[in-house]
Amino acid sequence: MQTIKPVSGNGRGIYEPKKSGLNFPLQLPTLLILSALGFVGAIAISWLLGNSHVTELFVRLHLVQSNPPQWLMPPQLSNNYYLLIPTLILFLVAQVVMKLFPEPTVLSQRLVGGLCLVLFVRYFAWRSFCSLNVANPVDGIFSITLLGMELLAMIGTAFQLLLLFTAKSRTAQADRCSIAVKEGRYNPTVDILIPTYNEPDFIVKRTIMGCQALNYERKQIYVLDDTRRQSMKQLAQELGCHYLTRPDNSHAKAGNLNSALKQTHGELVVVFDADFVPTTNFLERTVGFFHNSKIGLLQTPQSYYNSDPIARNLGLENVLTPEEEVFYRYLQPIRDGAGSVVCAGTSFIARRSALQEIDYFVTDSVSEDYFTGIRLSAKGYELAYLNEKLSAGLAAESIGAHIDQRLRWGRGTLQAFFIKSNPLTIPGLNPWQRLAHLEGLAHWLTCFPRVFFLFVPIISTFAQLNPINTSLPETLYVTLPYYVLLLSVFSWLNRRSRSILLSDIYSIVQAIPVLFTVVKVLLNPFGKGFIVTPKGMARDKFNYNWSLAMPMTILLGATLISFCISLFKFPEAGMSLGLVWGAYNLVTIAVAMMTLLDLPKLSLYEWYNRKQEVNLYGDRHVYPGKTQKISEEGVEIVLDPAVHLPTNVMVELIPEILVVSGRVTRSCTVDGALNAIVKFQNVTTEQHRELVELLYCRPGQWETRKIPNELQSGLILFKLLLRPLVFLNSKKVKQMKLHY
């Protein structure tokens, strides 16, 4: 079993695995995968070299393509455009269902999901039996590879549509269970664990204060400091919570949690990452579930109180949802129905006795949370998911940190193939649970088709290959209905958390780094240790991530050249594919490259749009106004009509009646009103608590934003291409500087 130790020096937040001493680094799953790839490669080479047996096999496949099953082919009609009727009917049915059920119900979800699943099977049957171009080895290899990549890209979606039939909501159950907790009839002891490794003190302080504000008496709060900082120990003492540490950092976060579990005694255990702040009703809404002895763990969503770097860099903070939203709003409920909820490592509550049965948290992977949940399921415990935003944390603050975080998640998940907690083989799981976990594992393999699709128009144009044999009637009758329905209902099915077009931007940004990580994991699954995502950082300059941009720049140039060639040779075979696909790739790659420009982040604190009444006191005068933004650092205020403010003032927030001293750092007159920035000064611990509770702990404050539909998403992409993003960002930075 690997052990993990902290790296000394400049590697902030890095745990490095010790060498295991194995003589054979390639493990059995890796050898099986390489053998399968070698077998497929040998067939392809044999076909290219003209091997008679292999050639005969593909001649027969070509005969199947030339004489496809009639049920897959379009009917013969006097006008091909009559073949649009099925697409129009499906589109209208989808619109009617979405109009009748703006929020998907179990029945409507199953109806639409079942229809999509049928069209999925029909489409891939047609692709397999009717559209392959295997007339010669070169076209054939390209055509079959494209089909395989399409299937790999969409198989996860097919699994999701199948699992939709088991989707579950526990809100009503939470309403019932919370009654006993609020009335004091069920109040088990709760230990709240906050593991920390190098996070700034002000972030951990915010989390501690949020945990102390929870509406629950029988709780103990523990800071688990894996860097043994004197300042963190003093912070815990100052705020009145427990401080735990250990002599080494073996097994990273999992080891930290396991060490704490052996020193604490609460019946239930809550884990919050150092940057996650709960709302005051977190325990009221979750503890009651454990009255049922079968419940081993309850997960709640990971929400974020700042925008992810992709949305921020594109200037779409108020439009895009965090990438994780589709997982917590759509995938976790269907996983809950299948009994395969994913433990996300934070914002969850578990039964101590259940953790003891599995020897606490799993230590042989960097995704200790995921595999701990699998072991609990295998032991017969039920993992539940409550789809309510009861906490919020800090999203990665730069595009580089965002990608590194995804690479860690992917690396940890794919380590499933190499450890005993493999959800596909571990005893105790049923077929539905294994299917749901297979969907999660397959997700990380979609980087291969995503990257391959970027090369398709380039290969098609330069090599003059035609990977898809199709006609206009087939396109209208088979391809169009499937994609039109999927585009129409995708965001509705996932509860408006993600659109296909905008989601593809996220996929392109991370596809190439994830692909290299997947290959590394398959060759050396434990070659890299746990890397903590840096949090609480500020920067005063633009930063373009050239390491991520370089491969995309090359792809953009090659795609542009292939597009121009296709434009002049449009009538030729294969060129129409290069033209249409190339145009799409040009748009998405260009927008993806825009996301790599990190904006300056001048404050360590988040400023929230919040309008409420405020009074300023100074020079024996009262100045009434309204807040525009509030943070732990200060407040932006509008006073209408404009007045002359003294430099030092007292700020009274209404209706909280929170009074804090402050200093006016910026002010300007706009349309007869005074806009002023007031920085708080000499904030006491109690005042800071009130600010944290106001900004982070109010139940229901973390909104569920709805993503634009596909048509709106397409318009957003084109607007991004047309507007001068760098100048927009410069303007935003100037506005930001007014606050600091």
Regions found by a protein language model. Name each.
Residues 225-232, 248-249:
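A conserved acidic beta->alpha catalytic loop
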Residues 539-740:
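Structured alpha-helical
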